Swiss-Prot record:
Known function: E3 ubiquitin-protein ligase that acts as a negative regulator of mTORC1 signaling by mediating ubiquitination of RagA/RRAGA and RHEB. Catalyzes 'Lys-63'-linked polyubiquitination of RagA/RRAGA in response to amino acid starvation, thereby regulating mTORC1 signaling. Also mediates monoubiquitination of RHEB, promoting its association with the TSC-TBC complex and subsequent inhibition. Also mediates 'Lys-48'-linked polyubiquitination of target proteins and their subsequent targeting to the proteasome for degradation.
Record field: transmembrane: 167-187
Organism from which the protein derives: Xenopus laevis (African clawed frog)
Reactions the enzyme catalyzes: S-ubiquitinyl-[E2 ubiquitin-conjugating enzyme]-L-cysteine + [acceptor protein]-L-lysine = [E2 ubiquitin-conjugating enzyme]-L-cysteine + N(6)-ubiquitinyl-[acceptor protein]-L-lysine
Lineage, uppermost ranks: Eukaryota, Metazoa, Chordata, Craniata, Vertebrata
GO cellular component: lysosomal membrane; lysosome; organelle membrane
Protein name: E3 ubiquitin-protein ligase rnf152-B
Entry-linked SUPFAM superfamilies: RING/U-box
Topology of the protein relative to the lipid bilayer: Single-pass membrane protein
């Protein structure tokens, strides 16, 4: 039951898409949360933003956009990269298609979501674009402190997921072959029936 509420916290309850940098969780005046894309669509069709659940009105001053509404801090706290210290390791994508880790200070006012584009000043006042990337557990730098049995369990779990995916693909292919075979039988029978009628009408 807890996973259902956790999933519903991570997705917009209007379009059921997960929150992302493009679909930021925006907090309405009534304290309900929707993604910024749904709110922009509502804003395009009506003057004020009306909450689809409680019908409460969130007024935006003229010239203000939906992006200026505050992010829901509870949702951002769940989907943002967890930070134990002030610096969080992120990958910086370089023009040469190489990446390296760099500690990026996390802003207290606006946490970065995975996939967000930020900017980091490098020596010599050069600016480089920074993309926040979530890292799988086994690729994190403190991998040496994790007991070996936990690592093996994680690899086994991933193997089960891969094998279940492969068995799903095989099932789909098998069902498709059976359907094609049955369709061939039906078409063959139809051609035999039409030939019988031709023989009867001619003879």
């Amino acid at each position: 039951m807890e996973t259902l509420s956790q999933d519903s916290l991570l997705e917009c309850q209007i379009c059921f898409n997960y929150y992302s940098p493009r679909r930021r969780p925006k907090l309405l005046d009534c304290k309900h949360t929707c993604c910024s894309v749904c709110l922009q669509q509502m804003r395009a069709s009506q003057k004020d933003l009306r909450c689809p659940w409680c019908r409460g009105v969130t007024k935006l001053p003229p010239g203000y956009s939906v992006s200026e509404l505050p992010d829901d801090p509870d949702v951002v706290a769940v989907i943002a990269i967890p930070h134990a210290s002030e610096n969080t390791p992120v990958f910086i994508k370089l023009p040469s298609n190489g990446c390296y880790m760099w500690p990026l200070p996390v802003s207290k006012e606006r946490a970065l979501l995975p996939g967000d584009i930020g900017c980091r000043l490098l020596p010599g006042n050069q600016q480089k674009p920074v993309t926040v990337v979530t890292m799988p557990m086994e690729q994190q730098p403190l991998h040496g402190n994790i007991p070996q049995d936990i690592i093996e369990e994680e690899h086994e779990r991933r193997g089960v997921v891969k094998s279940s995916t492969w068995s799903g693909v095989c099932t789909v292919i098998l069902v498709a072959c059976v359907l094609v075979f049955l369709l061939g039988i039906v078409l063959h029978n139809m051609s035999c029936i039409s030939k019988r009628f031709t023989v009867i009408s001619c003879g």
